[in-house]
Structures are given as C-alpha cells and as structure tokens.
C-alpha cells in the first residue's frame, strides 16, 4: 500500500491532511544521555518540541518528503536482544542484557513496551537494524489520537533513542503529524535538529534546538 494521504493499520486510520491553522511545532531537540558504559557508543534521545497541549501521532516519510535518520562518521549501535521500535524494548530483561536499554530504536513518547500502543507500517527495518540509515518514502510509526503517549510532556515528545559510534553524529530529517491543543491536525515536514558530535555525549548536555519550520 502506498503511503500518501492515509495510513491504514490494525488500530484504525490516521489521516495525513494538514490544516491551514498555525502549527504548534516549535522545533526539535537532541539530548545526550549517560548510558553508563552499558553499550559501546554515544546515546541520544530525539524530541519534537511543541506548544502546550499538542501531541505527535505519526512520524512518516512519503514520496514528497523522505524520512532519513543517519549517522555521520559511524553507524547505529544495536542490541541483539532488541528491535527497531520501543515495542521491542522489554524492561524485564534490562538486568540480564544491559545493552537493551540503550540500543537504537524509534518510538512515540515511551522508552519501553510497557503500556505502549505504538504501531508501524511500510518501513523496511533491515538496514537500520544492521547499523545503517533509517530511510522511508512510504512508511510510518504512529499511535492513534486517543493514545496518551503522543501528548507533549514538558513541551516535547520523544520520537527515538539512537546510540551511535563513539564520536559520530546523528543527522537527518523527519516529518510529523499531530494535533494542537484544540484537536486540530497539523503537519511539519523536512524538520531537522542540530547534529550533536560525540564529544558532547556527556550527561547534562541537552536541548540542542533544531531549526523551526511551520506548515
């Protein structure tokens, strides 16, 4: 199925028709987090910054706006016990497999599979799972507008955790759809963030603001 204007999945349908109202999208931020040396790389969490009361329902790529998340100067680091989305991250195994908590995966709002309604469609994850770029022009990971995990917390929504080779940078651009505080649908396309060099991967270095683009 071609991903253009509508996503169809087992949890229902998510329209991608943007409105003409002002967007609640404010930018993107990239936080470096301390992985305690439990995985061989620098770990970052990628957020969408939003106005109060807004939410993210989908991160997508289509024929007009390709999604591309990659690494400059290295590769993604993965755990053999995880998978490409937060639905594959089971916290019951963190004690036995510490690297699982810090591997690379996409999400909306949550870091584990607990109470997680995340779904995905149309994405071939094989290249990403092998450590190379995540690219799609016909896919999405998403939640429905009724799922609480899409709501902003502290003005932002987590959309991915990425561990990269020491000294490498996370680069790329994504497209999102969500709703503002009044429930009006919006899109922000080809949005990006300031790449964080691995030298900054220290606890307390956070909130690198991406460029702002409204639609």
Regions found by a protein language model. Give the residues of each.
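Bacterial N-terminal signal peptides that target proteins for export
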Residues: 1-8
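N-terminal signal peptide c-region/cleavage motif recognized by signal peptidases
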Residues: 17-19
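Non-catalytic macromolecular-recognition regions in eukaryotic signaling proteins
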Residues: 23-193
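Membrane-interface capping segments at transmembrane-helix boundaries
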Residues: 214-215
């Amino acid at each position: 199925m071609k991903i253009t204007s509508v996503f169809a999945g087992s949890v229902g349908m998510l329209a991608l028709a943007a409105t003409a109202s002002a967007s609640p999208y404010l930018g993107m931020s990239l936080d470096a987090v301390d992985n305690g040396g439990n995985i061989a790389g620098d770990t970052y969490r990628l957020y969408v910054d939003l106005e109060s009361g807004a939410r993210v329902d989908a991160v997508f790529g289509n024929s007009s706006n390709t999604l591309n998340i990659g690494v400059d100067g290295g590769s993604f680091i993965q755990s053999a016990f995880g998978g490409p989305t937060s639905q594959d991250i089971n916290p019951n195994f963190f004690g036995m497999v510490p690297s699982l908590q810090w591997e690379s995966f996409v999400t909306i709002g949550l870091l584990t599979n607990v109470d997680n309604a995340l779904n995905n469609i149309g994405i071939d994850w094989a290249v990403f799972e092998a450590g190379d770029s995540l690219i799609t022009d016909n896919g999405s990971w998403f939640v429905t507008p009724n799922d609480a995990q899409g709501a902003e917390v502290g003005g932002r929504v987590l959309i991915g955790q990425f561990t990269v080779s020491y000294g490498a940078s996370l680069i790329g651009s994504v497209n999102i759809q969500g709703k503002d505080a009044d429930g009006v649908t919006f899109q922000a396309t080809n949005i990006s963030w300031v790449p964080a060099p691995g030298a900054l991967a220290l606890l307390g270095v956070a909130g690198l603001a991406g460029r702002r683009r409204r639609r």
